[in-house]
Amino acid sequence: MLPCRSTGRRHALQHQPPQFKAHTGQRSTRSASIHRDRNNPDAHITSLEGQNPRPFGCSPPRSLQQQPAKPPQRGSLLDRDGIENITELWDRLQLLKQTLDHMPMADGLKPLKNFKSLQELLSLGGERLLGELAKQNIRVRQMMNEVAPLLHEDGSCTSLNYHLQPVIGVIYGPTGCGKSQLLRNLLSAQLVTPAPETVFFIVPQVDMIPPSEIKSWEMQICEGNYVPGPEGTIIPQSGTLCPKFVKLSYDDLTLDHNYDVSDPENIFAQAAARGPIAIIMDECMENLGSHKGVSKFFHAFPSKLHDKFPKCTGYTVFVVLHNMNPRRDLAGNIANLKIQSKLHIMSPRMHPTQLNRFINTYTKGLPLAISLLLKDIFNHHAQRCCYDWIIYNTNPEHEALQWSYLHPKDGLMPMYLNIQAHLYKILEHIHRVLNDRERWSRAYHVRKNKYQ
């Protein structure tokens, strides 16, 4: 008897997805599941828009396309701020151009082309040039704002060295130009910071100092030691109520024990142990040109005193010279002094050839027109009966303070030669733009006449 065969219906396998028959004209592809595998949720993540993948390059139906990024639109250059900047810059450029045109030394300068008026500039300048001028005026404002924290409200400088140490300065001036008064004013007006507690006044012979000058020194250095305080009080600027004034001959200065900081008899070391000191050499040009070297006081002394005596927070040396280029300098004191000096204080009454030589040496980074402008400033003040001075700072706190003007009433005023040089370069740029336009116009007319 044959065994019995089960004739019942086959049961479908559980968890088996239904099979769909592929179209005969379409290649079968594996369709992605709309469900995620819980063991690997990030595998085959697709959009839920449909089972079949869309052809390459076709955007999905009803999908939002991202718009391409557009460059930011530039605002109008002739708005109120733009016109204000251009107008302000135009006034500055016109003032500089008129000054340069009326200089006696302007014969050697090339004439610069410019627009006849502000209205002509605004109408014919063009978008590119006007935009550049507006940006340049913003830059000029930034240059002026950078130096504002270093000035008083009236625009004068708050200090000559701005706590930069040591202070080594040379004063050039002929007889009778007010060099001694200038030295006292620098200390009494608190232009040298910190204020010295001991001032050494060195001359060839102590007997040559008149009593009235000694009294003036004592009064003015005491005046420079105080500033006005609240409610009518005065505040001392140093550790002493009355700075000490010490008269010293040049021979006493060059004694052997004064060269050694560790020597207990060194008078400069004794004073440095109490506070800042200042050394003033007046009428000592002949002594400086001798064989005895004193260059140690210009470069070796400051660092040694600062290291040995912490209270000596200031070291100031001012040397008076009647000639900017003395022939007699046997020990090299004057040459070394001019190298180490950070401040060159010049009287406009010095010989013009010496001043021009100094200006040509120290203004090589400035345009020729600005150098000639500086020479014209010296010539202008040389004709005035005023005890004013022009100062060159080799290491200024700001570039605008490299050249400054010291007036008895106005104080120490910066000359802003860096801004004047920047404005002159703008004038040169306008000149080049107008030259290019004229050249293009000539070339256009030549070609036009050629084909007619």
Swiss-Prot record:
User: Keywords on this record?
Assistant: Activator, ATP-binding, DNA-binding, Host nucleus, Nucleotide-binding, Phosphoprotein, Transcription, Transcription regulation, Viral genome packaging, Viral release from host cell, Virion
Identify the InterPro entries for this entry. Adeno_IVa2 (IPR003389), P-loop_NTPase (IPR027417)
GO BP annotations, alphabetical order: DNA-templated transcription; nuclear capsid assembly; regulation of DNA-templated transcription; viral DNA genome packaging via site-specific sequence recognition; viral release from host cell; viral transcription
Q: Where is this region: DNA-binding?
A: 442-452
Q: Which amino acid positions bind ATP, per UniProt?
A: G173, P174, T175, G176, C177, G178, K179, S180
What's a Gene Ontology MF term here? Answer: DNA binding
Induction statement: Expressed in the intermediate phase of the viral replicative cycle.
Q: Which Pfam families match?
A: Adeno_IVa2
What subcellular locations does the record give? Virion; Host nucleus, Host nucleoplasm; Host nucleus, Host nucleolus
Annotated stretches, region: Disordered: 1-78
Q: Which SUPFAM superfamilies match?
A: P-loop containing nucleoside triphosphate hydrolases
Gene Ontology CC entries for this record: host cell nucleolus; host cell nucleoplasm; virion component
The record's function comment reads: Component of the packaging machinery which encapsidates the viral DNA into preformed capsids and transcriptional activator of the viral major late promoter (MLP). Binds, along with packaging proteins 2 and 3, to the specific packaging sequence on the left end of viral genomic DNA and displays ATPase activity thereby providing the power stroke of the packaging machinery. The activity of packaging protein IVa2 is stimulated by protein 33K which acts as a terminase. May be the protein that pumps DNA into the capsid powered by ATP hydrolysis.
Q: Which family does it belong to?
A: Belongs to the adenoviridae packaging protein 1 family.
The cross-references to HAMAP family, in alphabetical order and at most eight, read:
ADV_PKG1 (MF_04057)
Its quaternary organisation is: Homodimer. Part of a genome packaging complex composed of packaging proteins 1, 2 and 3; this complex specifically binds to the packaging sequence on the left end of viral genomic DNA and performs packaging of the viral genome. Interacts with protein 33K.
- Protein name, entry field: Packaging protein 1
Gene that this polypeptide is encoded by: IVa2
